[in-house]
């Protein structure tokens, strides 16, 4: 484009010299040359500032690392590598034996606990009846002891000291039986009264454990979180998969919008507004230009973020060298859909300022696209 402008200016200058018969000497030639330098430089500077361009752009994709929620040996892996997978389809399975065994054991424990509750209720009824019986016997023995005691206070005592002592001991022994029966009844009642939301606490605990065990059993089948595809599937049956967030075993690429992430000079920030028109060219599609819209400007420069590390930190980058990130959403296009995710691109954004100069940027971008046909491999 620069050469085209220069040639156009040379042609116009030649025409002016011929039409107006301007004498050709060192002064007129110098004036024409300097005029061309200022004109071309001014146009290029206006274009660069008002219609930003960057060659640092990429068809961005968000990947989901797949990590199992439970640990086990892989028994089955999907064969849909690099193919569209619907949400909920199986990605891989883990050996479920020990998780199924825990579910079975907890179900048995829950059934036993439920039966034990019925047994406790029966024992409580029996303890209440026993308490009533031994209490009645205690009352009878107490009256008998009182009778012996009153008789011993009469002028003529009809009872011997041994009879009185036996009556007293019988009463005390029966009273101890009553206290033991009441304690047993209270213990059973305490076990039955340990309630959570109207249900016996042991039953609630076992139900919660069973729910967790069933969840873990379900997690032995790892499914697609959404529509998308998996690539570079390296796990095989027999692989040990651990529930560690730092050790994903598969990468899932969900379906998402055609989005380009571009890094612009910080000088261009005032001319980058969401909603501006944008054009994108790809190295893989020479000669083609794709239209889109600038949708957002990231509110932070990546190199300016810091994390607490317990030590003093300096700047991570030289200020001004790290670019501003913007996202461009492309119009629907089958050629773009066929491109691999992550492929590189070049982007131009057209602002409302000096819109007539945008023609230069558009021509330059198309020339860049055609230049992608030219490369050498050695």
From Swiss-Prot:
Pfam families: CusB_dom_1, HlyD_D23. Gene3D superfamilies: 2.40.30.170, 2.40.50.100. It is a multi-pass membrane protein. Keywords: Cell inner membrane, Cell membrane, Membrane, Transmembrane, Transmembrane helix. Residues 1-3, 48-54, 254-280, 331-378 are periplasmic. It is found in: Cell inner membrane. The keyword ATP-binding does not apply. The chain crosses the membrane at residues 4-24, 27-47, 55-75, 233-253, 281-301, 310-330. Residues 25-26, 76-232, 302-309 are cytoplasmic. GO terms for cellular component: plasma membrane. PANTHER family: INNER MEMBRANE PROTEIN YIAV-RELATED, MEMBRANE FUSION SUBUNIT OF EMRAB-TOLC MULTIDRUG EFFLUX PUMP. Belongs to the membrane fusion protein (MFP) (TC 8.A.1) family. This is Inner membrane protein YibH.
């Amino acid at each position: 484009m620069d050469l085209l402008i220069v040639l156009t200016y040379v042609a116009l200058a030649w025409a002016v010299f011929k039409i107006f018969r301007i004498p050709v000497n060192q002064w007129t030639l110098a004036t024409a040359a300097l005029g061309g330098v200022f004109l071309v430089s001014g146009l290029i500077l206006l274009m660069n500032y008002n219609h930003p361009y960057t060659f640092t752009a990429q068809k961005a994709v968000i990947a989901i690392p797949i990590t199992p929620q439970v640990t086990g040996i892989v028994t089955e892996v999907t064969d849909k590598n690099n193919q569209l997978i619907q949400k909920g389809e199986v990605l891989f399975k883990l050996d479920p034996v020990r998780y199924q065994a825990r579910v079975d054991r907890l179900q048995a424990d829950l059934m036993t606990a439920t039966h034990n509750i019925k047994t406790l209720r029966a024992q409580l009824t029996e303890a209440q009846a026993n308490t009533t019986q031994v209490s009645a016997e205690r009352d009878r023995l107490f009256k008998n002891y009182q009778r012996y005691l009153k008789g011993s206070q009469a002028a003529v005592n009809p009872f011997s000291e041994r009879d009185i002592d036996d009556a007293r001991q019988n009463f005390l022994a029966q009273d101890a039986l009553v206290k033991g029966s009441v304690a047993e009844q209270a213990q059973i009642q305490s076990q039955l009264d340990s309630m959570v939301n109207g249900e016996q606490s042991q039953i609630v605990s076992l139900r919660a454990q069973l729910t967790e065990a069933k969840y873990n059993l379900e997690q032995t089948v790892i499914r697609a979180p959404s529509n998308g595809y998996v690539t570079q599937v390296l796990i095989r049956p027999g692989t040990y998969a651990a529930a560690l967030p730092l050790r994903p075993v598969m990468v899932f690429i969900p379906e998402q919008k055609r989005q380009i992430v571009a890094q612009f000079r910080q000088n261009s920030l005032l001319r980058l507004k969401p909603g501006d028109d944008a054009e994108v060219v790809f190295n893989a599609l020479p000669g083609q230009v794709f239209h889109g819209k600038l949708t957002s400007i990231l509110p932070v420069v990546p190199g300016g973020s810091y994390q607490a590390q317990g030590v003093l930190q300096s700047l991570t980058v030289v200020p001004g060298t790290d670019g501003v990130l913007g996202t461009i959403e492309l119009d629907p296009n089958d050629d773009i859909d066929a491109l691999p995710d992550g492929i590189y691109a070049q982007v131009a954004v057209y602002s409302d300022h000096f819109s007539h100069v945008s023609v230069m940027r558009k021509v330059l971008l198309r020339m860049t696209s055609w230049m992608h046909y030219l490369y050498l491999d050695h």
